[in-house]
A protein has these predicted regions:
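Active-site-proximal alpha-helix that buttresses catalytic centers in soluble enzyme cores
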Residues: 1-135
């Protein structure tokens, strides 16, 4: 993932926003998504940010990116549904950041789990697990 030392000179970026956990293993799937985006779209800045329990926070990422020329940001909530964090906490944080960084466009996406493509993928994974031979 892009860090201040290795960040590409990109004007657009993606922040994968997740809840956070004290367990370092919990972060691995989300960080794998970020690495996949980096491989597929090397001209985009991409990183993960967390609500709590691990770093960096969304405000930390914006503080860094604001000094590195990233002015068009998509925040992608890595949640399966729109619970309280997606409905209340994240919009509140995002609105405060828009006020703090008026020159930066911050677009808050719907939670990833509410995308029909993700719903279909999860259904396919569940079905394939049921069709595997018993071991």
């Amino acid at each position: 993932m892009a860090t201040p030392m290795t960040m590409p000179k990109a004007s657009s970026g993606i922040i994968l926003f997740a809840h956070g956990s004290r367990d370092p293993q919990w972060r691995l799937p989300i960080e794998a998504v970020a690495r996949s985006i980096e491989r597929e779209q090397p001209g985009l800045a991409v990183t993960c940010a967390y609500l709590e329990l691990c770093q960096p926070s969304l405000p930390d990422v914006l503080a860094d990116w604001s000094t590195n020329g990233v002015t068009n940001i998509s925040v992608v909530p890595m949640f399966l549904g729109a619970g309280r964090h997606a409905r209340e906490d994240l919009p509140s944080i995002t609105e405060a950041l828009r006020r703090q960084y008026p020159a930066i466009t911050i677009r808050l996406q719907t939670p990833i789990g509410e995308d029909a493509r993700m719903t279909e993928l999860m259904a396919q994974i569940a079905v394939s697990s049921a069709l595997q031979p018993a071991q």
